From Swiss-Prot:
Keywords: Actin-binding, Allergen, Cytoplasm, Cytoskeleton, Disulfide bond, Phosphoprotein. It comes from Olea europaea (Common olive). Disulfide bonds join C13-C118. This is Profilin-2. Phosphorylated by MAP kinases. GO terms for cellular component: cell cortex; cytoskeleton. It comes from the Eukaryota. Occurs in many kinds of cells as a complex with monomeric actin in a 1:1 ratio. One of its GO terms (molecular function) is actin monomer binding. The variability of the residues taking part of IgE-binding epitopes might be responsible of the difference in cross-reactivity among olive pollen cultivars, and between distantly related pollen species, leading to a variable range of allergy reactions among atopic patients. A motif (Involved in PIP2 interaction) lies at residues 84-100.
């Protein structure tokens, strides 16, 4: 399966029990910041933004004072799983990032999608990739 198919079929899919509702944007990036696959609406990001995210995975709490920035948008960092998941909130939407052995799985949502739905979609794919050694 191509990386784009993972984004299209597993991240941008309709949410369980909510046909027509899906994430606003999603991507899979290598830990070097290279884009493996992304949805059309995934924001253009700066390398420094990805470096900040990677630093927070290695040093949990790094982004808390400044917020998580992606594509110029600022997210308030909320409770995640140190070293494994970063979650952010911005207005009525937010972001979930799951770190795997080689990749970062991103999901961005807006209402009516809930934080829990975004977490479930992103973390399920991230856990699958971890099981596959990726």
């Amino acid at each position: 399966m191509s990386w784009q198919a993972y984004v299209d079929d597993h991240l941008m899919c309709d949410l369980e029990g909510n046909p027509g509702h899906h994430l606003a944007a999603a991507a899979i990036l290598g830990q070097d910041g290279s884009v493996w696959a992304q949805s059309t609406a995934f924001p253009q990001f700066k390398p420094d933004e990805i470096n900040g995210i990677l630093t927070d995975f290695n040093e949990p709490g790094h982004l808390a004072p400044t917020g998580l920035h992606l594509g110029g948008a600022k997210y308030m960092v909320i409770q995640g799983e140190p070293g494994a998941v970063i979650r952010g909130k911005k207005g009525s939407g937010g972001i979930t990032i799951k770190k795997t052995g080689q990749a970062l799985v991103f999901g961005i949502y807006e209402e009516p999608v809930t934080p829990g739905q975004c977490n479930m979609v992103v973390e399920r794919l991230g856990d699958y990739l971890l099981e596959q050694g990726l």
